[in-house]
Amino acid sequence: YDTEENQWGGTVTGGLKISMFDVTNVSKPKEAFTEIIGKAGTYSEVLYNHKALMFSLSKGIMAFPLNRTTDDYKSDFSGAYIYNVSNDSIDIRNMITHRESDKTYGDEIIRIIYIGDYLYTFSENKMQVHSIDTNNKVSELIIK
């Protein structure tokens, strides 16, 4: 969320920030909620591709793919963050991953959609189906 210049002249971000704004007064929006996810190197496809964000106010959910890093630039989570969303709050609901080991190529979640009461997550290697109501994995299809 905060960006610094590194010693070589490039930039490094300090985590991923999500915010909710109170726009009751459109000319003076107020940050009502904020969360910083991960450390420098944390990445989400949604930073560069708006289609990677799944949002449904009627379902009360928001989801996006995420590769989270720690202080030493090591990845400690690769998958999707799922949030409960209402008019006045955002709360983490579930974290879904396709990874079965630390270094599995092609298991990074790149898209999330919902159909009915099910959430579908897609990576190059898998498609998983999760119940929105229970957060449980219902099905998995290996694409390899």
Regions found by a protein language model. Give the residues of each.
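Feature marking well-ordered beta-strand scaffolds used for ligand recognition
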Residues: 1-144
